[in-house]
Amino acid sequence: MSKKSLASLSSADISGKRALVRVDFNVPVDDQGKITDDTRIRAALPTIQDLTQKGAKVILASHFGRPKGVDDKLRLTPVAKRLSELLGQEVIKTDDSIGDEVAAKVAALQNGQVLLLENVRFYPEEEKNDAEFAKKLAANADFYVNDAFGTAHRAHASTEGVTKFLSPSVAGYLVEKELQYLQNAIENPQRPLAAIIGGSKVSSKIGVIETLLEKCDKLIIGGGMIFTFYKARGLSVGKSLVEEDKLELAKSLEAKAKERGVALLLPTDVVLADNFAPDANSQTVSIENIPDGWMGLDIGPDSVKFFQEALADTKTVIWNGPMGVFEFDKFAAGTEAIAHTLAEIGKTGTTTIIGGGDSVAAVEKVGLADQMSHISTGGGASLELLEGKVLPGIAALDDA
């Protein structure tokens, strides 16, 4: 899926032209509306700065939250302010994403100026990928850049619909980097390739586990979903989370791994709690000895050693999903140990890819984000790409 990228456009191609850039500025904010983490805004800077330096007029479009119609609490005003600080130049803000006010402000733009449209999801037509709305969004621009990997798995007006009206339609630097790392890891990895899949439910990770069984040399499973595998093996799991309707699936995944010669590794010990709370009583036991009335909330120290040994000779590692309930400090050790392990093996040339979602938060929590080869900005989009699915927002871009 090789796509035309912004890097292929020179100053001569785009100077004075109006660029509609889809970014993902869906950042977390506190009760006062202050941004608590600007990672997503900073992630878009290389694309925005390249466009301004090449003399384009930059029009940014993003969603923010899940508004039902216009919602003053979900306006992009704090984002415009933060982006202005990061760019060191004024970011012009509109109160709408289409219409006369937008057209007038775009017409007044000088080369190298940046304008941020209001939250595109104020219009229900955005998520319906309405062609008329897409046409209105596109009307103010000459070409299109998609740098919002986090929404690339959605066929919305600002991610897919606008490409029908704007040419060229290219990938921004963030999207290009995501595709390069995630697709390479699946299609052409340095081996041995290991995947670490965590999270609470097998059901949400079935697709990715099945695809990775075709590609991986080792598959490490952690998080709440391990108990469905244990129960399928006939072990007692106390009151741990189990998806009863997925027991047969767990058996078939283990059988499939065996058949394909893939090492499917489950934890050997677990940290138990007497209830689901940050201050619960805890004990560590082997997986054969889980007593009634207790639930597993993390992997144990022996499992950490077992996984570290399995990862020692790998050349590529993809990690998606935590090993336990890392939001509770008492049950965060397993997840944090995996983060430290990846940072260590990364120093000796192993490519370490953090595939979006909670594992990103975990790596950031322990301050190791800058020691990973690549941290994906997309949760659902990363998973779907790892599953081998076509992402509509990427498919719609011009081929390289």
UniProtKB/Swiss-Prot annotation:
Cite the annotated pathway: Carbohydrate degradation; glycolysis; pyruvate from D-glyceraldehyde 3-phosphate: step 2/5
UniProt GO cellular component terms: cytosol
Its BP terms in the Gene Ontology are: gluconeogenesis; glycolytic process
Q: What class of enzyme is it?
A: transferase
Name where it's found: Cytoplasm
- Supply the alphabetized keyword list: ATP-binding, Cytoplasm, Glycolysis, Kinase, Nucleotide-binding, Transferase
Q: What is its EC number?
A: 2.7.2.3
Q: Which residues of this UniProt protein bind substrate?
A: 24-26, 40, 63-66, 121, 154
Q: Catalyzes what?
A: (2R)-3-phosphoglycerate + ATP = (2R)-3-phospho-glyceroyl phosphate + ADP
Pfam families noted in UniProt: PGK (PF00162)
Q: Which positions bind ATP?
A: 205, 296, 327, 356-359
Q: Which GO terms describe its molecular function?
A: ADP binding; ATP binding; phosphoglycerate kinase activity
Say which domain of life the source belongs to: Bacteria
Q: How does it assemble?
A: Monomer.
What family is it from? Belongs to the phosphoglycerate kinase family.
Q: What is this protein called?
A: Phosphoglycerate kinase
Organism (species): Nostoc punctiforme (strain ATCC 29133 / PCC 73102)
